[in-house]
Amino acid sequence: MTVGKSSKMLQHIDYRMRCILQDGRIFIGTFKAFDKHMNLILCDCDEFRKIKPKNSKQAEREEKRVLGLVLLRGENLVSMTVEGPPPKDTGIARVPLAGAAGGPGIGRAAGRGIPAGVPMPQAPAGLAGPVRGVGGPSQQVMTPQGRGTVAAAAAAATASIAGAPTQYPPGRGGPPPPMGRGAPPPGMMGPPPGMRPPMGPPMGIPPGRGTPMGMPPPGMRPPPPGMRGPPPPGMRPPRP
C-alpha cells in the first residue's frame, strides 16, 4: 500500500498508542509499523483485561500483563487512541553526527605492532646493506651521452683490449716460448752457433716405426756380399 508522508498513521509512529480489541482487551505500546490490513506492531506492549467476579457483590478487577513485542491483527482491532508522546531515547548509543563537536578523547590506531615511541632495531654492521648512493655505478656511466661519444668510447675500449699485452699472474711465469722446427726438447743441448739443427724423420714416416731402405728386418741375416736382397713386392727379379 502506498502511504503518503501526510498520512495520520505515519504521524503517530513511535507514539504510545492504546489499541482496543473486539473482546475488550486493551494493548498499550509503542507504535512501530503497520500495513494496508491495519496489522500493527507494538513495542514494549502491556495487556490490560477486565475480569468479571463470580459474585455480583464483588467489583470487576483489572489484570495487567507485560508482553513486549506484539503483532496485532487488523481484523480484531476496534479503535486506536494516543496514550502519550514518543519516549525519550535515554541511554541509547547513537552514531555522532559529522558536524558535532568532538569530545576530550584522542583518536588513535589500534595497538598493533611496535609502539610509536620505541626506536626501530638496527641491523648489525656486517649484515646491513650498502648506504644509499654507495656501491652503484659512477656518475660518468649514468650520465646520458650522445651517439658519437658512445661510439668513440666503444672503439677506444676495443683498441685497448686488442693491443694490450696479456697479463699473467705473478709466480706462474710468462707465456710459453715459441717452438721452432729445430728447437731441442727440454733437457738437451742445442747445436753450436752457425750449424743447422739435425733434420728429423720425414713427415710421412712416424718415428720409431719401419727400417731404412736396404736393411733387413730384425731377426734375419743380411745377404752375403755381392748378392742383392729379394726384390720388393710387385716387381720381377732381373734376368741373368
Curated annotation (Swiss-Prot):
Methylated by PRMT5. Arg-108 and Arg-112 are dimethylated, probably to asymmetric dimethylarginine. This is Small nuclear ribonucleoprotein-associated proteins B and B'. GO terms for molecular function: histone pre-mRNA DCP binding; RNA binding; snRNP binding; telomerase RNA binding; U1 snRNP binding; U2 snRNP binding. GO terms for biological process: 7-methylguanosine cap hypermethylation; mRNA splicing, via spliceosome; protein methylation; RNA splicing; spliceosomal snRNP assembly; U2-type prespliceosome assembly. Core component of the spliceosomal U1, U2, U4 and U5 small nuclear ribonucleoproteins (snRNPs), the building blocks of the spliceosome. Most spliceosomal snRNPs contain a common set of Sm proteins, SNRPB, SNRPD1, SNRPD2, SNRPD3, SNRPE, SNRPF and SNRPG that assemble in a heptameric protein ring on the Sm site of the small nuclear RNA to form the core snRNP. Component of the U1 snRNP. The U1 snRNP is composed of the U1 snRNA and the 7 core Sm proteins SNRPB, SNRPD1, SNRPD2, SNRPD3, SNRPE, SNRPF and SNRPG, and at least three U1 snRNP-specific proteins SNRNP70/U1-70K, SNRPA/U1-A and SNRPC/U1-C. The gene is SNRPB. The lineage of its organism: Eukaryota, Metazoa, Chordata, Craniata, Vertebrata. The keyword Nucleus applies. Pfam families: LSM. It comes from Homo sapiens (Human).
